[in-house]
Amino acid sequence: MSGAESYRHITVLLNEAVDALAVREDGVYVDGTFGRGGHSRLILSRLGDAGRLIVFDKDPQAIAVAEELARSDKRVGVVHGGFASFQTALDGLGIGKVDGALFDLGISSPQIDDGSRGFSFRFDAPLDMRMDTTRGMSAAEWIAVASEQDLHEVIKNYGEERFSRQIVRAIVAQRAESPIDTTRKLAQIVAQNVRTRERGQDPATRTFQAIRIFINRELEEVGAVLPQVMCRLKEGGRLAVIAFHSLEDRIVKQFVKKYSQHEPLPSWAAVREADLPDPPLKIVGRALKPGEAEIAANPRARSAVLRVAERTAGPIPE
């Protein structure tokens, strides 16, 4: 097995997410988070010869798998980069409107389970945490130079960590003596400063999650891509997003809610709401979570939430 394929990945909500796209044989679709291609391969199985699938990923290992797939299937186009470049990338490929876009947010199992990537406190490895290891600042580099206030804001806001102040003070004290450059060093600092343990959760979980989200600009990218997708969806096109973190899901939920209803009209308005054009999005079904069987087979699916919206003929507000 190659390095790109040696870590098992179970795609979460596989059929549900692809079913939500209502794939047309001749449609153009985007998988904004290729990973190891679970969703992409199922989409391809439902596309005809005239269909196209554009896949995005930051991770060089994921891109290696995607490019191998593209060599054997000419319907596939590959973008090495974050999905925040959605419209620019589609423009570069000569693609206008699309029939659907799927995003499976957060970190993949191969990234967690490859100790050398520095995402997990289960391994002693260089503290990297970059999804794209070819660019940007590693977690260790950021921890070395970040202000105490920045460290606190990231760990408190992105990790929702109650003991962020204590953790940050310990980080600042330790880095003055020696670099915090491995996952074990950071995990030990956190463990010594988290007074209350959550059942079934390592004390370092929230801090590692927070730093990873910050290093990879995960929340900013979600917020940036959603309006781009809305602009590029054809009428009837679908947006499907799987979120694993409450902050990600909140961004998706609020966006879809905002653009699936009208702004309240003032009492003096001369027009009735019924006379207004449709909002640009329509919510499709309820938020969907994995069933007990899927969670039993893949415990990492437990926190997943799938939300789906459909583009209407309504104009996008300026």
UniProtKB/Swiss-Prot annotation:
Gene Ontology cellular component terms for the protein in this record: cytoplasm
Top-level taxon of the source organism: Bacteria
Keyword Transport recorded: no
Stated role: Specifically methylates the N4 position of cytidine in position 1402 (C1402) of 16S rRNA.
Subcellular location: Cytoplasm
Name assigned to this protein: Ribosomal RNA small subunit methyltransferase H
Reaction(s) catalysed by this chain's protein: cytidine(1402) in 16S rRNA + S-adenosyl-L-methionine = N(4)-methylcytidine(1402) in 16S rRNA + S-adenosyl-L-homocysteine + H(+)
Keywords of this entry: Cytoplasm, Methyltransferase, rRNA processing, S-adenosyl-L-methionine, Transferase
EC number: 2.1.1.199
Keyword Methyltransferase belongs to the record: yes
Family of this protein: Belongs to the methyltransferase superfamily. RsmH family.
Binding-site positions, S-adenosyl-L-methionine: 37-39, 57, 83, 104, 111
Pfam families associated with the record: Methyltransf_5 (PF01795)
